[in-house]
Amino acid sequence: MRSRLLAATVTALAATALTTACDDAPEAVQLQPSTQPSTQPSSTRPLTLAPCTDLPDLPTAECGSITVPLDRANPGAGTTTVAFARVPRTDQSQPPLGTIVPNPGGPGTSTIDFSGPLYAQGLAPVLDRRDLLLIDPRGTGRSTPLTCDALADPTLALAGLDERRTAIGECGEQLGDRSAQHSTTAVAAADDDIRAGLGIEELDLFGDSYGTFLMATYAQRHPERTASAVLSGAYSVTERTEGAMGAAALRRAITLVCERTRQCDGPTALADLSALATTLRATPSTVDVELDGATRQVPLDEWQLAGAVGKAFSSAPDPELQVGVATAASAARTGDLTPIRTLVSRYLATEVATAAAGVQAYAVAADWAVSCHDYPEAFPGGGDDREAAYERGLAALDDADFAPFSARAWSTRGSYDSGACLKWPHAPSQGAPFTAGAPMPDVPVLVLSGDLDANTPVEAGKQAAAQFPNAEVVEVRNAGHTPSVSEGGMVRILEFYAAR
């Protein structure tokens, strides 16, 4: 699901040397780098590549770009540029075994600069005979940036729910048709243009978080070009995960962390959080956030608490932080809010820093353009009065399913507000890239879910796997969101590629 900026997408923890697949695996087309970069219109004409002079962590990388239509059904709408970089396989003496194309998620996150070196490092054991193709989705990174003034202020992360939703809606108004032009199907189409231009027969898809949504879309639309897929921190294109499913995963994760660290008791921690949430719902407090030497005071209520606690279990595991949630809730039982204020303050400062990272790393407008256009509505059927329909749906939820928080606080928390797009202009093309049960390629698919992930839980991974006829689901112990960043997860990924 949406994870604003992944702390790391792939890790180099996989130090175990794994042999590559057998020599009689299907060959991909041998690529020959050119001497000059070029930007070419969308077509099957060969693309040219040149050494990337500004990627020191990827010294062999070759860069290029392609110009594609903003709207393929309306040539007069103009064009946009999509950037890519290819890291050639290290062993050029043998036939290639494929091309891995990863996406780190977001939406809105850069692939080339932000996570390219991490993918290259983590996948190194299988990149001797596989190329690595890094593509910045349209609107992000080195591709033509998508921006909107309404979301330019990173301190919007400190704003209340209504102010955030209003700003997101204003961004949609400012983008107009450009929102639909940066949808997941548009991103997948550009990816296939690059594949064709480089003469690659098939792609080995690798998605983290939103990348699993993108790669499922590519596979559905281009089945004959899909060789395999790895989906890490996965979710289905037709289901939402931030509601009761995520709350159940949070309860499980807190219990597991306490059991495994032996530094807290799961049921007690959940009871303490529930008591604190009840208190802050009735009597909000305040918390100070330090930003660039200045102090901002913001409300500390149940909604803010749900955002901070949910985020602690929606990224790569941090045992100190996660045990700290239980410790802070316990202290609050005795009237000491200092630890919980520290937890929330750090969470909010991180949210602001993420929003301030800049379009080269994280394009907030591209994030919301995809999220509001492609993700299913939480409570559809409102017609012209989506907000009223949403409120009716929210009111009908059972708080018990969202413990230790209320249904409202959990369902609208921070970056995972299920009503974030209520003010976004509705587009006729809005909706999931494909429907449940749509035909998918019968290729090997590995789905990894972390047992400590409250963002894209194990159940969401099973739903993602069910989209494909031949998918294996692996629950990775002690892994959080995007298990590819865990040692156990990356080892499974390398084994998957080595077996092909």
Predicted segments with their positions:
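Structural motif
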Residues: 289-308, 313-320, 355-365
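Bacterial signal peptide processing site
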Residues: 23-25
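Flexible "cap/lid" loop of the alpha/beta hydrolase fold
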Residues: 235-253, 325, 337-356, 360
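Alpha/beta-hydrolase-fold serine-hydrolase catalytic core, especially in secreted/extracellular enzymes
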Residues: 332, 349-354, 498-500
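Bacterial N-terminal signal peptides that target proteins for export
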Residues: 1-9
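C-terminal motif of bacterial Sec signal peptides marking the signal peptidase cleavage site
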Residues: 18-21
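Gly/Pro-rich cap/lid or specificity-loop segments adjacent to the active site
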Residues: 28-30, 40-307, 369, 375, ...
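Long, low-complexity segments enriched in small/aliphatic residues
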Residues: 338-375, 379-380, 389-395
